[in-house]
Amino acid sequence: MSKNLLIELGLEELPAYVVTPSEKQLGERLATFLTENRLSFEDIQTFSTPRRLAVRVSGLADQQTDLTEDFKGPAKKIALDADGNFSKAAQGFVRGKGLTTDAIEFREVKGEEYVYVTKHEAGKPAKEVLLGVTEVLSAMTFPVSMHWANNSFEYIRPVHTLTVLLNDEALELDFLDIHSGCVSRGHRFLGTETTITSADSYEADLRSQCVIVDAKERQEMIVEQIKTLEVEQGVQVDIDENLLNEVLNLVEFPTAFMGSFEAKYLDIPEEVLVTSMKNHQRYFVVRDQAGHLMPNFVSVRNGNDQAIENVIKGNEKVLVARLEDGEFFWREDQKLQIADLVAKLTNVTFHEKIGSLAEHMDRTRVIAASLAKEANLSAEEVTAVDRAAQIYKFDLLTGMVGEFDELQGIMGEKYALLAGEDAAVATAIREHYLPDAAGGALPETKVGAVLALADKLDTLLSFFSVGLIPSGSNDPYALRRATQGIVRILDHFGWRIPMDKLVDSLYDLSFDSLTYTNKADVMNFIRARVDKMMGKAAPKDIREAILASSTFVVPEMLAVAEALVKASHTENYKPAVESLSRAFNLAEKADASVQVDPSLFENEQENTLFAAIQGLTLAGSAAQQLEQVFALSPVINDFFDNTMVMAEDQALKNNRLAILSDLVSKAKTIAAFNQLNTK
């Protein structure tokens, strides 16, 4: 007869960003534990609040399934001695399995007999197996952990309760310094300690203590309450998904309310207001029906609506203090001169091993000038890039960015416009930070894109040059994100700038502040980012073939990946790739100094293939270029069918290998086709 299992771990408040991943991890780890221990179940449901992680297993078998395993031992000739008795090898084998030689039987495997034993293990009761669930809790991993009291162990937060129920029976377990039972804790202010009467009553028992344990239900409550406020007040509320996910993990019993602030603060840039409300106070932004910011906000209380007016006033007071700071910095920063701020950047450290921000900007300016030419920017755009590169970090020394660092670049754009800088320059100051997250927005202007590329390239090369190279998951300076940004920007703008030649040219530059080193590591790092970009849709063999090509032009590589993926589903893909692979493999034996001599051709097939290679222009899109190369497949096959490439005559052999080398030289600009898998 199946039962339902409940496990709840009660803790001090968890960081909001940890709650949802930890809830998921607990469910996955418990499912693995049950499967590995042969306890079948029907369903697993997880729960979480800032103060608890829980999981309920429905339809849990009351006993493990029986286990029958066959074990293969030594060969019969080793298992028996000269007298036909079991040898020490055979005896040791069965003893290791907890059996005796009586269990031995011989089975033939590929013409030879081997010792086999069959071990039967009766399933244990579920209650006995579940004593091991503390292993699941101990195995949980978190971004940070802590010690508390005088304990030697550490965990994400101090543990207060452990509830383990099999239907309505409490199981006796010990985890860290806690003994399990059926007691849980209600809402910190509105509830008390409470008894969970059964696994099935979990939600109801805690609801009576003002705790909504289902995160999805809390989210729905918050959204519904906000929608009600929208209707009542005739406004629109920006329900930012990331903020919503954070807020629902800050509360156990949500109550949304609307507060207000003086309209005079609307004169502050909208980004400052939104940052103050959303990022610092976890408030939802309120707009009118036309989308204009209103002097209101929506917040979510961890509790009911008792004394809600006092709560509203308290939140308003806290926000106004933030807005006062924003208003002050907005006013005072406008008194500053960009040139003065730029001059002070010589005293701001970019990194202690690399130098100052001013030196970083100087290198970026040189790189940006080179990129502007490669990207064929207009004279006006080149001028804008150069000016932007001279000043683009100045806002880091403003009071506003000092207080609200999320606004770096954004305030730079605004202050630059107020100071009379060209709009293209101001926009580039903001856009050079983009993309600021995986999948984040890209620069929209060429000037901003070039500055972003230059800034990211110097950052990458500088950190690698002083040995600060990411390893494993450790990437404290976000170099993977910066490099991914480089790849995405190049692809977005379609700039066919060969990365290998570009990086070579950067390593030829000379700076007093820094000498670039570790070029090979940089190139491998960039290749890994391109590989990741292709990996979204392309299998490993296609990615490896493209990365082994003779071209390192990001937009072309990504386009070839897409074209090869599509082509791999067509009928002619396999024969075309196989003929090209054969050519690639033979071409490796060619003498690079040998040029094709048509006078040495002995058959029409040599003439035909050579002419086809000479006429191969590889023009058009990646798909069209691939089609042109694949179209050579019959000609290549005809050549192989009628020509002995590895002829005894050395001149003929070298000439035929040179033909194939010419073919590979052109085809390899698309991909190394012999890396592709056709099985």
Curated annotation (Swiss-Prot):
Subcellular location: Cytoplasm
Main location: cytoplasm
Intrachain disulfide bonds: none
GO BP terms, alphabetized: arginyl-tRNA aminoacylation; glycyl-tRNA aminoacylation
EC number from the UniProt entry: 6.1.1.14
Nucleotide-binding as UniProt keyword: yes
Coiled-coil annotated residue ranges, if any: none
Catalytic activity: tRNA(Gly) + glycine + ATP = glycyl-tRNA(Gly) + AMP + diphosphate
GO terms assigned for molecular function: arginine-tRNA ligase activity; ATP binding; glycine-tRNA ligase activity
GO CC annotations on file: cytosol
Keywords in alphabetical order: Aminoacyl-tRNA synthetase, ATP-binding, Cytoplasm, Ligase, Nucleotide-binding, Protein biosynthesis
Pfam family name, one: tRNA_synt_2f
Protein family membership: Belongs to the class-II aminoacyl-tRNA synthetase family.
Subunit structure: Tetramer of two alpha and two beta subunits.
PANTHER family assigned to the protein according to its UniProt record, in alphabetical order: GLYCINE--TRNA LIGASE, CHLOROPLASTIC_MITOCHONDRIAL 2 (PTHR30075:SF2), GLYCYL-TRNA SYNTHETASE (PTHR30075)
Protein known as: Glycine--tRNA ligase beta subunit
Organism field: Streptococcus pyogenes serotype M2 (strain MGAS10270)
Species classification: Bacteria, Bacillati, Bacillota, Bacilli, Lactobacillales
